[in-house]
């Protein structure tokens, strides 16, 4: 058989992999497709296949012989890995389209998942070719299909959100990139990612969090293990800036900007959006003021906000109106008395320092309740006894 002859020829070319080829041949002859699939997953990850067109040849000379007999989503995984070895994007797209046609020809009930997985990779190739319109069309079609399905394999979601994030990154749509990248991580094991990949993604996520419209909650990102990739590198400053934003710490932010001025200037997006960044940290400073006050003290003098943010009263009013407009807070500004009554603030993910502050507030509340109870017991013993 041609497939076995091909394995034999590979054994002669790479005698050090003889055991692998013998194992693959044995499983193939016994038609143990599931076990063969698991072996192939390990095999194609070997270093010898990571350069040139070795995987392309392996696919066409061996895997094609039984491709529709194995799990079709696993076939899609193999096809995507193989497609990345094509030097020409157009050839890679044509190859993926041929695999999709084979999937459709099987008429299996669950072919939508593997097709979406492959189509998503096609979208990435289109994006790399500069065809944003076609990339967007493929992603929109994929999203519609995913929304109508249930029990979807995490790898399909991960691939979809990764390509979506790259589309938004290409267009400098920071908020959409941030959402897509976080969703990608939700369906991906961080331990399986390379250190360089984690560092690049952590950097991009951090920038998009700072620059994205209506992103005012950094707790979820800071709690994610991927952010630790920034520590001990030459971009660790970005992690500390995120911490400053999360705490609404204007003083720390300004100090970090001073110390890391050269690194900040090297990031054009940060330079271009300097005013927006200052507005955002001022808003977060306001949120920190609100959360740090006792629950019964909801009326805040504008002078306190002005002192913390180093803004004029007029600029504080603009800051409050911005916060109200993006629905970070609800309340009423009293210009006559120079105060704002805050009736609601958007919930947020709390860090350890914020949780400790909340604990202190709860302890204070418990003490007040206990004092009140003692007072009631002392003044109305008969009522309490009853």
Curated annotation (Swiss-Prot):
InterPro entries: PCI_dom, PSD13_N, PSMD13, WH_DNA-bd_sf
GO-annotated cellular components: proteasome complex
Pfam families in the record: PCI, PSD13_N
Signal peptide range: none
Annotated S-S bridges: none
Keyword annotations of the record: Acetylation, Proteasome
Tissue specificity as recorded in UniProt: Ubiquitous with highest expression in flowers.
Domain named PCI: residues: 173-347
Positions of modified residues (N-acetylalanine): 2
Oligomeric form and interacting partners: Component of the 19S regulatory particle (RP/PA700) lid subcomplex of the 26S proteasome. The 26S proteasome is composed of a core protease (CP), known as the 20S proteasome, capped at one or both ends by the 19S regulatory particle (RP/PA700). The RP/PA700 complex is composed of at least 17 different subunits in two subcomplexes, the base and the lid, which form the portions proximal and distal to the 20S proteolytic core, respectively.
Function of the protein: Acts as a regulatory subunit of the 26S proteasome which is involved in the ATP-dependent degradation of ubiquitinated proteins.
Family assignment from sequence similarity: Belongs to the proteasome subunit S11 family.
Record's protein name: 26S proteasome non-ATPase regulatory subunit 13 homolog A
């Amino acid at each position: 058989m041609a497939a076995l002859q091909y394995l034999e020829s590979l054994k002669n070319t790479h005698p050090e992999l003889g055991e692998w080829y013998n194992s693959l041949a044995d499983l193939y002859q016994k038609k143990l497709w599931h076990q063969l699939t698991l072996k192939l997953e390990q095999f194609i990850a070997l270093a010898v296949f990571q350069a040139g067109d070795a995987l392309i040849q392996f696919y066409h000379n061996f895997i094609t012989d039984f491709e529709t007999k194995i799990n079709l989503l696993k076939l899609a995984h193999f096809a995507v890995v193989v497609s990345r070895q094509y030097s020409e994007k157009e050839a890679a797209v044509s190859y993926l389209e041929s695999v999709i046609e084979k999937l459709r020809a099987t008429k299996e009930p669950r072919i939508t998942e593997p097709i979406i997985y492959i189509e998503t990779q096609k979208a990435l190739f289109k994006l790399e070719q500069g065809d944003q319109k076609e990339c967007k069309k493929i992603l929109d079609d994929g999203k519609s299909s995913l929304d109508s399905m249930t029990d979807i394999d995490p790898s399909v979601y991960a691939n979809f959100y990764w390509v979506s994030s790259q589309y938004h990154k290409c267009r400098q749509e920071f908020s959409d990139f941030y959402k897509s990248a976080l969703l990608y991580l939700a369906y991906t094991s961080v331990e399986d990612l390379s250190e360089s990949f984690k560092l690049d993604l952590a950097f991009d996520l951090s920038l998009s969090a700072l620059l994205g419209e209506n992103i005012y909650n950094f707790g979820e990102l800071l709690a994610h293990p991927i952010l630790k990739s920034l520590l001990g590198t030459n971009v660790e400053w970005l992690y500390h800036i995120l911490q400053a934003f999360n705490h609404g710490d204007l003083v720390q932010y300004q100090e970090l900007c001073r110390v890391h001025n050269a690194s900040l200037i090297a990031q054009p997006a940060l330079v271009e959006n300097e005013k927006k960044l200052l507005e955002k940290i001022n808003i977060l400073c306001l949120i920190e003021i609100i959360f740090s006050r006792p629950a019964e003290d909801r009326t805040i003098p504008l002078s306190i906000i002005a002192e913390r943010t180093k803004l004029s009263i007029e600029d504080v009013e603009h800051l409050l109106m911005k916060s109200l407009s993006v629905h970070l807070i609800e309340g009423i500004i009293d210009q006559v008395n120079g105060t704002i009554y805050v009736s609601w603030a958007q919930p947020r993910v709390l860090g350890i320092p914020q949780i400790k502050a909340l604990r202190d507030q709860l302890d204070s509340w418990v003490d007040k309740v206990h004092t009140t109870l003692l007072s009631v017991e002392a003044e109305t013993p008969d009522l309490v006894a009853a």
